[in-house]
Every structure is written in C-alpha cells, then in structure tokens.
C-alpha cells in the first residue's frame, strides 16, 4: 500500500516539522471523526492511513529524541 507520504519522506523532517505534521494529522483525524458522526464520510479507509502515519511520526520522533540525548 502506497501512502501519500512514506517513512523515507518523514525521515527528512526535523523535530519541529515532525511535531507540526503530527498536529496536522491529528486535526485531520478529528475532522474525519466529525464527518463520520454526521454521516458525511465516504472514505473510511483514511482512518487507517492517517493513524499509521501518526504512529510512524511518533516512532521517528521518539527515536530522534533518544539518539540526541547523551548517555548517562
């Protein structure tokens, strides 16, 4: 399955861009849920795609933050 943005493209982002992208995707999820509740949503497959992208970005963010911290 080819998503609009792949993990390779996400790896090019810095931490602030990742945070902005996560916020945008979470807003998109909220909008999808609202459309679903009002029976206006025809593209239910987008839930899975967006949730997967959020998970990928959170994983990438966590790995970047742990690699930047010095070992104690």
Curated annotation (Swiss-Prot):
Keyword Ribosomal protein: yes
GO cellular component terms listed in the entry, alphabetical order: cytosolic large ribosomal subunit
Organism of derivation: Prochlorococcus marinus subsp. pastoris (strain CCMP1986 / NIES-2087 / MED4)
Gene3D superfamilies: 1.10.287.310
SUPFAM superfamilies (alphabetical): Ribosomal protein L29 (L29p)
Signal peptide interval: none
GO biological process terms, semicolon-separated: translation
Family: Belongs to the universal ribosomal protein uL29 family.
Protein name according to UniProt: Large ribosomal subunit protein uL29
Keyword list, A-Z: Ribonucleoprotein, Ribosomal protein
Name of encoding gene: rpmC
Gene Ontology terms, MF aspect: structural constituent of ribosome
